[in-house]
Amino acid sequence: METFNFSVPQDITVEKGSLSKLPEIAKKLGGKHALIISGPHLEKMGLVKKAADYLASVDIKADTFTDIEANPSVTTVEKATAKYLESGADFIVAFGGGSPMDVAKAVGVVAKYGGSVTDYEGAHKVPGPIVPLIAIPTTAGTGSEVTAFSVITDHSRNYKLTVFSYEILPKYAILDAELITTAPASVAAACGIDAFIHAEEAYVSTAASPFSDALAEKAMALIGKNIRRFVANRNDIEAAEAMMTGSLFAGIAFSFARLGNVHAMSHPVSAFFDVPHGVANAVLLPVIAEYNALADHGKYLTIYNDISPIPAYADEFEPMMLVDAIRELCADIGIPENLTIAINNASRTGTVTKEEIESKIEPMAVDAMKSGNIAVNPRASRQCDIEMLYRRAL
């Protein structure tokens, strides 16, 4: 049997209504003053105040920082770190989707060790434990509550940098499915397909193991069978619970098996054009699934049966059937048809022409090749291959 190592050094609560357990968990952490890092949407909905009130019920003070954008920047990390230091907080509550989670992890590093988040770019540059962190996701999702990554946009380089260190794993995670029912359909779709892609890329990764495969398979089954239902009705608590659990399993799976070309290529798209992360992944997925089909050794059939309403048997299955099923799923949940549409949907300055996009393909490919995920993609890729895949996605 193949040998492998794994460790999941976190305390994870998965329970409907478990936001109410925040005071108990904060007490376990020994915290007396929290900085809640969240987004403006949750603040407007009163959920940030609800979390702060829970903490106040056990005499834990809470300050808040909610000025967080999609694809959060180095500047946002600097502002949030300043807020943490000025407030006198001694732990962080990351409350929201992937953006608040990424910022909270980065703040936990910089507040403890100083400098800029850029000083910790790359693998294993965080010298030790960070500020204690409780993660409460409100999307399903990034899986950030169980991953050792923080992704931050450096606008000076049009580049999404990654901090990778097991030191930045949250000590505690609270997964309350009631929280994800507040997401708009577009957010539920983008986050849900992102979670599915985490599992899919981990599953076909050359670094996959029996452990990561088991988690990825369960994640794909949960998400694939529920994502249409959840996007159509976010108040469907059964579907919400399945999506949240699937996202959790996918996050753990890719923490061990890494990802692939989809994530390597989507980060530059978000850095150059501010396309939401999940949307960028989704429009690239069918193109890259087709490219990787030559390297399939039977796993595509499993993936297909997780997302297709009509199952297939091995003797009738062709890998291109999965590509078609992915396109059908993305259309059903409202994902843009191609990269050109996705970029224009995200544009704040008017129409972005195909020529303008094509002018960025080479620098995007250069940045994509810097990602460690390229190395574990099931089919080897050169820069010219990445450029070709971007063009196919247009």
Where do the language-model regions lie?
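N-terminal amphipathic/basic leader segments beginning at the initiator methionine
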Residues: 1-29
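A glycine/threonine-rich phosphate-anchoring loop and its flanking beta-alpha core
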Residues: 112-208, 299-302, 306
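Active-site segments that bind and position negatively charged phosphate/pyrophosphate groups
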Residues: 202-328
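C-terminal charged capping/lid subdomain of soluble metabolic enzymes
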Residues: 308-394
